[in-house]
Structures are given as C-alpha cells and as structure tokens.
Amino acid sequence: MRRVFAMLQAGMMLNPGLLAAAPPPPTVKTTTPIRHLVIIFQENVSFDHYFGTYPVATNPSGEPHFKAAAGTPTINGLNNALLNNNPNLNPLNLAGATNPFRLDRSDAATNDQDHDYTPEQAAFDGGLMDLFPLNTGTPGPPPGAPPIADTTGLVMGYYDGNTVTALWNYAQHYAMSDNSYDTNFGPSTPGAINLVSGQTNGVIQSLNGSGSIVPDGNGGFTLNSDADPVGDVCSTSSGETVQMGGQNIGNLLNAAGVSWGFFEGGFNLSIVNSNGSTGCSRSTTSAITATKKADYIPHHQPFQYYVSTANPTHARPSSVKLIGQQGDGANHQYDILDFYAAIRAGNFPAVSFLKAPGFQDGHAGYSDPLDEQTFIVDVINFLQGQPEWANTAVVINYDDSDGWYDHQLGQIVNTSAVPLADVLTNGSCGSGATALPGINSSTLHAQGRCGYGPRLPYMVISPWARRNFVDHTMTDQSSTIRFIEDNWLDGQRIGNGSFDTIANSITQMFDFKQVDDNDLFILNDKTGEVEFSSSSN
C-alpha cells in the first residue's frame, strides 16, 4: 500500500472518479468506446509455457502466492493426462522424452528453443504434438532445475502463477484467450510482419543471402525466418537483410489521419546507458540472466521493412507534440521513452505498438519472465494513472512460441507446399492450392505461409474488458489489425492476401455495454502481486 501512495504522490495514479471524464479526441471517430489501443508485443512464449496449469499454482514457500477467484473459468490447458502421460514420452525424443514439468521462479533464465518455420512444423508431427524435444528442444537452464531440463526436454517446461504472477493476475481481472495463434509457423520477424500487415509474402529485396525466404510459387518470395530490415542503420552489415512490398496497417492509419506509432527500446541512438553503451550498441545486462543484450533489435521492428513507414536513420521527432502525427521526420518510429513522454505531454496516439528493450521482451536466452513482468506492469500501471485510461485498451500478444511445447493443434486455415520447408504432415502443409494470395494479383496462392502456427497468449486489459473472462474464439496475430480496422477505419482491410480478411474479431473480449469507471488494478512490478484494486475481482 505504501507503494500505491508513492505512485499517487508521483502523479502515476489519478482519482478513480476522474477516469470517466477523459474526453475522446475530437477529430477521431471510433466504432467502440476505445480511443487508444496499446499493443504490448512480447517475444517467444507458447500458451502452455505460461498458462498451461492456470488457474492452479503450486505456491511454494517464499514465492509470490496466487489463488484464483471463485468462479474462475476453465481453460484448454494441461489436463492430468497431458501432465502424466504426455505424447512427448515418445521414445523418438531420446533423452528428452518427458512429461511437462514446472519451472520454478528460480529457473527464470533458460536457453532459447528452436522456433524456426520447419522445426516447429516437425514438432507438431501431423497433429500428434509429440516430437517437441526432438525438433525444437534445446537444453540449458541454471543449476537447480529438474535434471530433464539439461536435455532437449527443457522445451516441455512451463511456469505457473508463482513466476508469471502478473499475467495470471491480469487474467483474473480482465480478459484472456486460450485459442489464439501465431498467424504462421516461424520466428520473430514473420510474427512481427503479421502483426502489422498479416502478409509475409512480397519480399522485394534480399541482400547477403536468402536463408529467410522461400519461393512463393509464382516467381516471388515469402519471408519465413528472421532477417534484419534493409537500410536500418542498426541492421547487420554482413548478415541477411530484406525489404517488404505491399501495405501495412500504418499506411491505412495515415490515409485516415489516425495517429499511431511503434515505440521500441533502444531506438533513440543518442541516449547513453548507465554502462556507457550508446548508438546501435546500447545495451542492458539483466540481473536475472546475467546476459548483456542490445536494447534495440532490428528484426523485431516490423515497420522498418517497408519504405513507406521506415525511419532508417532513427531520426528523432522534431517535437513531442508531433509524436504519432504525419509529416515528421521520425515517420511514426520512436523509442519506448517517447511513448511515456508523449502521453505526459497530453499527446496519446490512437494506436501504439510497444516493444520492450531486449532484456525485458521475454525472449528466452537473453530475457526472462521476471524482467518481462517488470516491463509489462510498469506500462500498465502508468496507463492506469492517465485520464485517458477510461477509453484505453491494452493488448498483450507474442511474436512466436520460441518452440516451447503447447498441446493444442490450431486449425490450418492457410496451406503451403514448399518442398523441404513445409513438413507438417507427409512433407507438406496441405496442398497449397487454397493458400491466400500474395501481394501481387498474379500470385493467386502464395506459398510459405503455413498457419495457424503455435498457440500464443493473448490478453485484453481495459476498463471495458470482460472480467475474469476466457475467450475461446479462434484468433491470431492479425486479429489485432482487424480490431484497428473495425474501430478506426470503418472495416477497411489491407487486402492483397492479408490474413486480416479471414481473422476473427477480439470484440468478444470486451463488454461495451458496461464499463468500470473506477477501474484501477495496480500490481507490483517485481512480484506481480496485487498492490491496489478498486474492485473485488
């Protein structure tokens, strides 16, 4: 409670009664009460890796305690059969064959798993979901974890509400999905591109190699792995870089005069960190992982891949008042600190994409769930202290699964048949004959976009979110685009083969007939425990 009072004195929280008084921007029309959407786009987590045993936590002594509220809905998680007789006991997994097992809070720092396009499909084994250790598993957490974690069986590990405490508490108070997916199989860059365009076809330039692209079946190429954006001053000078054609959601928002921005840690190259690092080498060493990581990671910044929305030199906004607006040299691409500065100056963009500094983005190998928790909680606590909170929604979503085990096979809504790349079932991902189009009208069925891929967490946090609600509607990363299009753009779609044309809505996670005007739900950014709640839930 002392922390709550400190935040009140610092201006981080407002009188709850003032929340309803926040006026909507006069020039922006929306179809819902949501005037500000903040997308926190994190890294490399499958649904079961964070929520497999929700809402039941082990609660060992000395760790943050979690107890679910009465009436908490059930989820499609790890049932007794999956926990005790899992298909990944398959002997083909060799020493890594194992049931799922709990990773303790002290095991927050783990190795990165294999999460490329083809290994993820191979792990699914035609829907048997039984070859994760063989295909995506990588050993290596710190000492003290179960011995199986020193094998490829680490991929079967999961956290519960004693480690990912904040996310479990947000799920109790707001809305989550247990049926949301990576739009395609594969790693960070395709996931980031799908977040903003729903279309990984249309690579128009590839330099220094071609390992991240596959033929689309019509003379063009589809992005299915990681590569830095062409022209970004922080991109690799020797590794592969690519550039995308087509439109993204930023183009549509610009045409409609809707303010928006992508805010990523480390984007401002003039800042000097406390360790003396600056420029593209700005870095932070996590106390949890003991790993130094660059704050800015080029292949996590999707708008940099499009000439129309790129800020290749990382030019600074000419004024805090112009953040989110057209015609400024920053071209809607900013540092994460600019997000806070703009809102404090009374300039809250309608649509904001947030990317944490590397050490806080949740990516195993250099980040972890505890550093990630600090970032997420700090953002949401800050937003709840703003007068605009009454008309704000926060989406928490992920770019890929990192290859971590999840038991649920999603529906394959888009097929692909690229030899050697697509191996989901019998050497392909369906026939590819019904695949969505590419960005060019002549590419009727663009290959290399097998999906939906692995199941990922998806949460909505807002005074308008349903309380303690689990949505079972099938959604994907491009469902966020669809909400933006429906709310600000009168349902206009990106088109040209974008998944936004087939994505389901997230509106069922809201209750637009009822709002909690006094909504405040403040968590501790280190433990994830509730420090203040204005409601009983």
Language-model region placement:
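Hydrophobic membrane-targeting alpha-helices
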Residues: 4, 16-20
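Hydrophobic core
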Residues: 9-17
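Sec-dependent signal peptide recognition
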Residues: 2-10
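N-terminal pro-sequences and low-complexity stem/linker regions of secreted or lumenal proteins
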Residues: 20-537
